[in-house]
């Protein structure tokens, strides 16, 4: 393996939506950082069988819906 061409691979802590934590190795962040998940297998509708909810971060979904609200409506 060539030296100095691969990203740093270190241990981080992943925090699930219910607060449980586990450690894994990753190239994300720095050694000891915490990665807080917004959605995970315990809360995602694909794995829980629930209805889908859209997380609107920064109003992007609402801006899209406002912009294209009448796009396919027939008069």
From Swiss-Prot:
The record's NCBIfam families line, in alphabetical order, gives: L31 (TIGR00105), PRK00528.1 (NF001809)
> Source species, please?
Rhodopseudomonas palustris (strain TIE-1)
Q: What does this protein do?
A: Binds the 23S rRNA.
> What do the Gene Ontology cellular component annotations say?
ribonucleoprotein complex; ribosome
GO BP terms in the entry: translation
Record's Pfam families? Ribosomal_L31 (PF01197)
Among the GO molecular function terms of this UniProt record, one is:
structural constituent of ribosome
Name the domain of life this protein comes from: Bacteria
* Spans traversing the lipid bilayer: none
Write out the similarity annotation: Belongs to the bacterial ribosomal protein bL31 family. Type A subfamily.
Recite the UniProt keywords alphabetically.
Ribonucleoprotein, Ribosomal protein, RNA-binding, rRNA-binding
Instruction: Tell me the name of the encoding gene.
Output: rpmE
Relate the assembly described in the record.
Answer: Part of the 50S ribosomal subunit.
> What protein am I looking at?
Large ribosomal subunit protein bL31
Q: Which InterPro entries match?
A: Ribosomal_bL28/bL31-like_sf, Ribosomal_bL31, Ribosomal_bL31_A, Ribosomal_bL31_sf
